[in-house]
């Protein structure tokens, strides 16, 4: 199986390079997410500029393009080392997509999809951590950052053989969020439901 492993890594990168945020926005007649809102082609920004339906479509597709390559590689019997490279390649494709001039997103949903095949128990605690952080803080970026920081410890607890590749994924996610970390520190980061609150304010007055 090691002979086909590099090909699967390349395939994962190409899958990751399919930017669902850009494609969904084009199909829905919405602005290019790279030039609107936060400038990030991801589900959160699509939520801001296009609403829940478009955002859900982007989220599902981004998760699947991380999940399916890893599941396929696992079904073919690749070792944890190669599975980790497949997962990282899918996220690298999302972040630096060859089909869209290497201007991609943060890789959070794709990384979650890539980790999901490890097990439902891990998937559950990861999703719970992400959702709870967002509900308590209102910051989508903080949910991603906290989840990325804790993910290696969760994986070490459930499936320790995958700790190293997941740690690499977490480092990649944190590096992509360096601007968000600075804005959070300065209290300049936008909350995920700021737009809805602004819409309600004139009516309340």
Swiss-Prot record:
InterPro entries: G3P_acylTferase_PlsY
Keyword field: Cell inner membrane, Cell membrane, Lipid biosynthesis, Lipid metabolism, Membrane, Phospholipid biosynthesis, Phospholipid metabolism, Transferase, Transmembrane, Transmembrane helix
Entry protein name: Glycerol-3-phosphate acyltransferase
TM stretches of this protein: 4-24, 80-100, 107-127, 130-150, 155-175
Membrane topology term: Multi-pass membrane protein
One BP annotation, GO: phospholipid biosynthetic process
Function: Catalyzes the transfer of an acyl group from acyl-phosphate (acyl-PO(4)) to glycerol-3-phosphate (G3P) to form lysophosphatidic acid (LPA). This enzyme utilizes acyl-phosphate as fatty acyl donor, but not acyl-CoA or acyl-ACP.
EC number, as in UniProt: 2.3.1.275
Reactions listed under catalytic activity: an acyl phosphate + sn-glycerol 3-phosphate = a 1-acyl-sn-glycero-3-phosphate + phosphate
Main location: membrane
Single GO cellular component term: plasma membrane
GO MF annotations in UniProt: acyl-phosphate glycerol-3-phosphate acyltransferase activity
Organism: Klebsiella pneumoniae subsp. pneumoniae (strain ATCC 700721 / MGH 78578)
Pathway: Lipid metabolism; phospholipid metabolism
